[in-house]
């Protein structure tokens, strides 16, 4: 996997690609984690990750001659290419008893080269940033990019080894990245229940003692639930109905996929998915053991739930940001980005547009059409230029998908990068939320908070919140718009970030229903917002830190070995169960029981949402 260069990307001339495609000076700046400017250091890796986010189609295996109906018309058209076998191969990574390939990769480097203290410090920063980032498609791609960046930064010159090309060869997949950094979170040390103080530091005794057996068993049960849910939704992408092997029934799919949007009915669990059914049915017992608001795990003296603490921290961060906004925007950003590199600041928004246009958006525009065309062209060009190399150097379990009949499925979109990995749509909403991806940029995080306040305060009467979204969005589209409310809290007012229209473009592309779902209805979107820790994810407020300060911070993170989430795993168990039930509708009695129990858990966390019943039945 990470052996010498004969296992890495081979150039056109047959020589070793020892540079890995990195720009000169790519590894010179101190690593800070989730830095949008890093994407510009290796365009080849960006193309590779976009390619690896798409499914592969192959011709279905023909039936044995003795099974063919003798009366069948020999002139029938051959079956269309299918992604079913590829989906099955990818979904295998989400089994609980499969090795984490990211952990295995790190272990291979450790055994072959040793892990330097500098690498450990950088990796600790990456882990900290992913725990503070919103789980979304762009975050998954960024985590993959920066994982490769760190391995090459420390081992490309020293070991003449590069991870560039590993995702194209399917040695690693974006599903492995999601599992390691966002689903199971192999490096997490809090057992799924945030125990950190408001300052973000770990209790010394807890950090020293680590997790007990009971904590790890309970967290493994949670991990099985979320991985099984993700796997079940991924398997719905297979475009053939289930047979006697018990695979999931395919769901008519896609905003722009191979079928019409699905407006009713649910998927069907087959016999092989009965363990997933059992896990979903027992979600409440699973959540109870990893719920910060429950009697089993509430810490003595705790007065705030994880959600209340996260909201309080966000409010305080926004107050600090706005108190230094003029100085910060006038100097620090410009110093950090320097002249002609200002556009790199919006790299995550541009990546959102590229990945999600026409696969997770409803309102078409010239920019979304061009972005969708660019994504398809990127995938097709990468496949055309690397196909020969990949045919002789691809992971064995994916070797079938580089044969002569294999072709990337560009119509379905970057399914493997998305959080929920299905392509179903309902009520003008899609599996991947555009607004969740916007949160990765500080200015857009702030703009979304202001936008929500403007929607809530738009009318002093009892106007429907849904009806308030369009006029607020329309007012924001006017460059000379005035604040919509006199005083709607800190940072109130209808202002937009100066991002050359990126924020408005993506908000319009998402559509009113998707905005409404994200802001007020969907438990997954609500948790994504709360999980995002701006004081950790974004660069510090004020002047950029000195390189020595950055290195000291990373060393502290590595030595403390305290990696805690912001939202307790019990709420994530609820959210994943909710999203799975949107695709696989439970029976009425089970559905009513779930809505009741989910509502109680959300109320205990003081997390108000509009009508879980409506969201469950009308959105995805």
UniProtKB/Swiss-Prot annotation:
UniProt keyword annotations, A-Z: Host cytoplasm, Host nucleus, Metal-binding, Zinc, Zinc-finger
Keyword RNA-binding tagged: no
Matching Pfam families: Herpes_env (PF01673)
Residues involved in Zn(2+) 3 binding: 306-307, 568, 605
InterPro entries (alphabetical): Herpes_env (IPR002597)
Transmembrane segments: none
GO molecular function, one term: zinc ion binding
Region (Zinc finger 3) location: 306-605
Cysteines paired by S-S bonds: none
Region (Zinc finger 2): 433-525
Keyword Cell cycle in annotation: no
Subcellular compartments: Host cytoplasm; Host nucleus
Binding site for Zn(2+) 2: 433, 436, 518, 525
Superkingdom to which the source organism belongs: Viruses
Residues holding Zn(2+) 1: 100, 103, 180, 186
Region span, Zinc finger 1: 100-186
Gene Ontology CC annotations of this record: host cell cytoplasm; host cell nucleus; viral envelope
Protein's job: Plays a role in efficient localization of neo-synthesized capsids to nuclear replication compartments, thereby controlling cleavage and packaging of virus genomic DNA.
Homology family: Belongs to the herpesviridae UL32 protein family.
Record protein name field: Packaging protein UL32 homolog
